[in-house]
């Protein structure tokens, strides 16, 4: 049976895990790290760079490096690179393809099935877009799972049959949510979830960047925010400073040659204390309180009844965040899980559940936001309340607002506001062909169906005529199937192109190495070779130098093979020649030792013990 992987597709970093012998294993990437930066860059030569290599070149290539794209998922955002528009789905797919390649390299087999996680507070459009990113990357997305739910699954699977209440506080690079779950006898039931999709570690970084820009402007009168390369350096420095301040009381941010003024190059040197950092980010910390209180209220659980608190996301390592969670819950967070990896581990376990590898586990998730339609007066009429366990199906009968109304326009929204326009519009469809009738007479049944991925289907039916209309809510950002297929093919072509580039680089490296070794061999031993062999090597060496000066890889391969052959022959000749010389020298030495009778000494061996 083909393996399935679990993927935490994060704002800042991503992680992939797989079940091995029933136990989840986090897969290290090609660079040896257990997490991969969610950064994609388009090099000038057309190569697509992902992860650590993309991060390393960001300073010199700021316009073509995309990070934190998860914040744009489910929107109409796009980026232009070389006159081509890339959607958030396509950029996310590049990161997923990198994780897929690394997993396949580790496992030694093709991987197609995956469970991908999303923030619990993602709406329908964002979930659809994440699923599409997986499809573009070549995955069959088995399930979209909420990150806190995956974390609870990873944490709670081995906790036995005792019923317990768990609070998951998930503060990642770009999103934040809080979930309350009940765990008992293999059943993991989400009671409530709340969050903020625009709050995360990136915002803490931005405060440091703003502080550095303001400080530098005050000292030198130069606004670094207008310099893209400088801003990339500030971004990296801010992230490092934030991490340092989790362990140290101060952090020195030193960036030489950050820009140039009238008098010459200028350097940035700022010391930031933890107290100062916490003061400038206090309002961000305060924004975590609202979703926490909402989740507790919706679950109908007292804070005192929460038995375990799990921290998820790298941003929870900040001391101020840990202290906030301790203050809100009255207990120390659990230290037994890795906040960077626990979500991917849970996703791998859920993949195991779906594949039948993990038994006796039932995951009951919820929809994070209420779903409904717009009715007369612009009112938002809810059909499915937030925190309803999914999958679920609800129906309600509506009627017309005007006499002889020939059709009904059904506008689907997701959110909590009473006025429909203030909520997130998911889609619109029309039920036509209604027979003339006074208002209030037609009976139109509207049914909402949410699947286990949290993706919505809506169905409207005129009970009088039997006419019906269906739609899968695709939101404004979702892509038509043909676009997904086209993007998947593009991604595959890029993968082939990247593979070809790697092979070309390896061929060139091997050829250059052989060239150097041969030149060294000639310098050290060329005078010992027969003239014919030396001429053959020089001729082959010249052909390889010429080939390396061009771009024809086949020519380089051919010249490399030819030089390898003649070099090997020459090496064999030299070895044989040296062996013959050594034999001759040995024979001469042996003859010298085997002298005449004058060289013979008569002697007795005396055994001292027998004396």
UniProtKB/Swiss-Prot annotation:
Residues 567-576 have a biased composition (Polar residues). Signal peptide: none annotated. Residues 599-611 have a biased composition (Acidic residues). Pfam families: HSP70. It comes from the Bacteria. Keywords: ATP-binding, Chaperone, Nucleotide-binding, Phosphoprotein, Stress response. The modification Phosphothreonine is found at residue 175. GO terms for molecular function: ATP binding; ATP-dependent protein folding chaperone; unfolded protein binding. InterPro entries: ATPase_NBD, Chaperone_DnaK, Heat_shock_70_CS, HSP70_C_sf, HSP70_peptide-bd_sf, Hsp_70_fam. Residues 480-508 have a biased composition (Basic and acidic residues). HAMAP family: DnaK (MF_00332). PANTHER family: HEAT SHOCK PROTEIN 70KDA. NCBIfam families: PRK00290.1, prok_dnaK. Acts as a chaperone. Belongs to the heat shock protein 70 family. This is Chaperone protein DnaK. It comes from Salinispora arenicola (strain CNS-205).
